[in-house]
């Protein structure tokens, strides 16, 4: 597979349903088992902490990216293989995007949705051709998928090949879909890393 590193976007909020945390932990473990590097936002709380723990416990390579203002002991995972501190949140997003060959959004809030939509937007305007997966735990992303269908139907989103978005309720199903995507116009185009 041309995918070597996967960027995971997800929530950092504590106190969410344990099913979300368990799915995030499983996702991290699966990435590690496949020999894939986890690229993520360096957090130790919520789903961020769970996905990192899952990967680390399975012996995976985990790289965290954090903006200076969030580089605090209460927030940042201390056990990461590598930690990169960036000047601001925009640089963090750009670095995470550059490091990754594919993206997965787990459930999350405004930050996760911002990262997800920026990634989809960049694909649509041709800045990258990397696949994006939604882990649809507990149907979390059902309303979002319906919204995207509506936008396609009403002509606000063009149904081209630029955006490759897959979803699955289970981590193993999602990773299988991501790793087996066939790009219509040749897979070599999106794997380029300048």
Task: Give the location of each predicted region.
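Flexible, glycine/proline-enriched loop segments at strand-loop-helix junctions
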Residues: 106-107, 131-135, 162-165
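Active-site/ligand-binding-proximal alpha/beta "capping" segment
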Residues: 91-126, 133, 184-192
């Amino acid at each position: 597979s041309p995918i070597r590193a996967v960027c995971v976007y997800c929530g950092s909020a504590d106190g969410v349903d344990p099913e979300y945390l368990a799915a995030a932990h499983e996702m991290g473990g699966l990435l590690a088992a496949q020999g894939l590097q986890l690229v993520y936002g360096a957090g130790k709380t919520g789903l961020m902490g769970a996905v990192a723990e899952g990967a680390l416990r399975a012996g995976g390579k985990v790289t965290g990216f954090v903006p200076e203002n969030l580089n605090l002991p209460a927030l940042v995972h201390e056990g990461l293989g590598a930690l990169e501190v960036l000047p601001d949140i925009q640089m963090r997003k750009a670095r995470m995007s550059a490091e990754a060959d594919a993206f997965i959004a787990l459930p999350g809030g405004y930050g996760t949705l911002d990262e997800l939509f920026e990634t989809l937007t960049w694909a649509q305007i041709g800045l990258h051709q990397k696949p994006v997966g939604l882990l649809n735990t507990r149907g979390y992303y059902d309303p979002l998928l319906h919204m995207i269908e509506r936008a396609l139907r009403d002509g606000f989103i063009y149904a081209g090949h630029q955006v490759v978005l897959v979803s699955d309720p289970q981590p193993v199903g999602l990773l299988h879909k991501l790793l087996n995507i066939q790009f219509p116009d040749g897979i070599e185009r999106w794997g380029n890393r300048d």
